Amino acid sequence: QHFNFNSIFHRHIKLFSKKFIHSFKGKKFKPMDLSTSKRVCTGITTNNKVEPKIGTHDGVFHCDEILACFILKKLPHYYNATIIRTRDETKLAECDVVVDVGGVYDPAIHRYDHHQRSFQETFSSLVPSKPWTTRLSSAGLVYVHFGRNVIAHLLNIESNDDLIDAVYDKVYENFIQEIDGIDNGIGICEGEQKYRITTHLSARIGNLNPSWNEPSNDALIQQRFERAMQLAGEEFQDKVFYYAHS
């Protein structure tokens, strides 16, 4: 009996195609929102490296880049990413994403610094439908672009779930915005304050830096940096879960 390989091959291809198409029936996909005047990413693309790299500055660390790094590492793409702490532009250029250093804000190349003199972005300027006008730090920048994805991942829900928008707004208004304001030196009110708050997250993160008279080395600073990420990350996740269930 003559064996018709081509006939069998094409029958298998046809059967596979039907199953593939059937698997997508009933699926809902959220269309990209092009209504804003500026591009706000909701995902991230790596350079296809085996070990993704997140770049930030070395030296004294602050709450904004600590939280920015934590948020990025909660994305599936960056869960096992290595954090490179440097100001060397050659090394930063090798990173998949750079936060709080480099003097560039450009989401197209995943650069999220806010220190350049020209930077005046707020949540409202990037997403005009939102009311918040506090100048963004690297924490706010990363949150604006990737917060929805991280919330969906933490809550294990679909990216088009209405709950995400509610939590996204509440976490910024009642948590991230405070970090943005403190990092940028924006006072909580006009005029003289009756007292100072020194136990907020930004202060506690700052206190983890080695003091001026404390013996220090790269290993100790790295240990403190990781401890700070854990502290900031726990509070961020607590806020997400709190607003998701309130």
Residue ranges of model-derived segments:
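Intrinsic-disorder-associated interaction segments
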Residues: N6-F9, I13, D165-Y168, K194, ...
